[in-house]
Amino acid sequence: PPAPPTGPSQPEKSIMRFEAPTTVSAAVKLLAGNARVTRVLAGGTDLLVQMRTDRVAPDLIVDVKRIPSLRTVTAKNGAFRIGAAVAGVELGEHKALRKAWPGVVEAANLIGSHQIQSRASLAGNLCNASPAADSVPALVAAGASAVIAGPRGKRTVPVEAIATGPGKTSLKKGEMVEAILLPKRPPRSGDAYLRFIPRSEMDIAVVGVGVNLTLDAKGVCTAARVALGAVAERVILVPDAAKALIGRTIDARALERLAAAASAACRPIDDKRGTKEFRIKVAGVLARRAAEAALKRARGT
């Protein structure tokens, strides 16, 4: 008979646990109590792919879809709370949310196919921490916040503070995003999200731009936020682009300054989907177009 192998023995794979708590506190306890690799499952559209390609091998998966507060969209005094496990397709079915934040809803409805949208959530898209995530520039432009639950209680942070780099977040051990908060819209406000992709649909953004703005009664821009995706290590807020709009009537000159500021903020990479130079140019073009779309909505036209 052949001699037994003499090399180092291969460690046995640990058995993966699957838990489905029904309260946030129970979910946090599970996340905080596991010493090894833990993942939260909301929609699973990113996690399951990562597991199948051996990019992650969790010892514990915590399914949060059975927590009622994470499965609902609630409106109060014009603001919205979106549970972390609410699927993108459900956002489009919420009339009040769609009317108040059409750019955010449009961005969510660009996450993959219709089948993916029936599972993928805004919180999952945010915590996956892809620089090219479609919903994140729209959320950042909207001034959205994330409610984080953890062993030390809850805290609320701007959504742009979650991702720290590709696939990396600022969440501490035992923490999870419980909900996304969208503020009340002032009158004469509008938002929009646009992206460039090589194909007509179901592709990753080469560049994504979210714009949110508010006008006064005379049509002067009083507030604006501009966010860019896929042009840096994470989605970025561009204050200089917003400054190009604030305090003036938005005309061709203001839009040119906006486009220039957006392009100047880019720190992209070269890859098979686009060169640095291409992304920088497209960012300016999309910023202008997204601002024009947001402006039309703010004017009610």
Locate each region found by the language model:
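C-terminal structural segment of proteins
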Residues: 5-301
